[in-house]
Amino acid sequence: MQTRQANTAYTLADVFRGMTLSEMQATAYDMSLPIPSKLRKAEYQEAIIHAIPEHIGDFLLRLARYELELLDQLVLIGSGKALIVPTLSINSALIANHIIQVEFLRNEHADCFTLSDELRPHIAQCLPAILNDPDRKPFDRLMQYAFGITNLYGALDYKKGMDMIVFRGMIDLDKPKARLLFKRFINSGFFLQCSQETIQNGKENQYFTSALMYELEPVLAETKARKKLVKRYNDFSDEEILAAGEFPYIRLMCDGYEELRKLLRAEFRMSDEQVRGTRYDSKSVGFIAI
């Protein structure tokens, strides 16, 4: 990872000044900010600017491990600097809710992340406790496993998602807590969209499309192709799924496809055949073994 000089003096007022009332309300909803809905635009802008620093700790609790690691790096490099990493191209809750700013460096094929000086001290105050909290380990592992599954399949219905993520022996959690954790990463910006579909017996089924699946969106648009992807669930080993889930974190730590191949072999005991079957391009996070 590299750093460079950047303008980190921008404020939340700068970020929200050009937004509509509905856009600010959407951000407040995503971050679970306690802001009254019946406010005028100027009043809402003032309220959200004060609410974000005050409730940033609650928001950070919902983030994936690699997002917290990215924030940690942005805090450590200090004021006036940006962090440059190989392009992630993800719909991170950090970006979607304007906690960090991102610029795509086309010539360097990298993303340039900046964190406002206004938010840095608030994040620095609560981030270490979250990163080092032993009680977060089940949640972090659940998130990692979920990233792996959605990288491989693209769409999950709620029941299958629960079965695949929690009740497969990966994590020993009681059902209510498992459902709570599942909802936490659904609401965290991890999923790009949620839609309800009516199946033949008249019951409604929820499908969640991963934010990491940009290159598979054309495939997911076709019902038959999506069913085929989900049907392939049993074709993948736990190691493959976990490796896919670990990929966003790996991209922050290393640069280059060959290094990634070595990591897959060493850390996840993937065979040469499995590694060769890994399809990767710079526009996506994660690999899709299709």
Place the predicted regions along the sequence by residue.
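Short, charged/polar micro-motifs that form catalytic or ligand-binding hotspots
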Residues: 14, 61, 77-84, 132, ...
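DNA-recognition alpha helix
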Residues: 28-29, 160-169
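Short, amphipathic alpha-helical interaction segments positioned at domain boundaries
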Residues: 57-59, 115-152, 211-241
